[in-house]
Amino acid sequence: ESECPWHPWC
């Protein structure tokens, strides 16, 4: 995903 500031599996 592009929005990855909120999930730690990025």
From Swiss-Prot:
Signal peptide: none
UniProt xrefs under PROSITE patterns: CONTRYPHAN
MF-aspect GO terms: ion channel regulator activity; toxin activity
Transmembrane intervals: none
Chief site of localization: secreted
Modified residues (D-tryptophan): 6
Protein name: Contryphan-Ar4
Subcellular location field: Secreted
Protein family membership: Belongs to the O2 superfamily. Contryphan family.
A cellular component annotation (GO) from this entry: extracellular region
Domain free text: The cysteine framework is C-C.
Disulfide bonds listed in the record: 4-10
Keywords associated with the record: Amidation, D-amino acid, Disulfide bond, Gamma-carboxyglutamic acid, Ion channel impairing toxin, Neurotoxin, Secreted, Toxin
Residues bearing PTM 4-carboxyglutamate: 3
Biological source species: Conus araneosus (Cobweb cone)
Tissue distribution of the protein: Expressed by the venom duct.
Protein role: Its target is unknown, but this toxin may modulate voltage-activated calcium channels (Cav) or calcium-dependent potassium channels (KCa).
Chain positions with Cysteine amide modification: 10
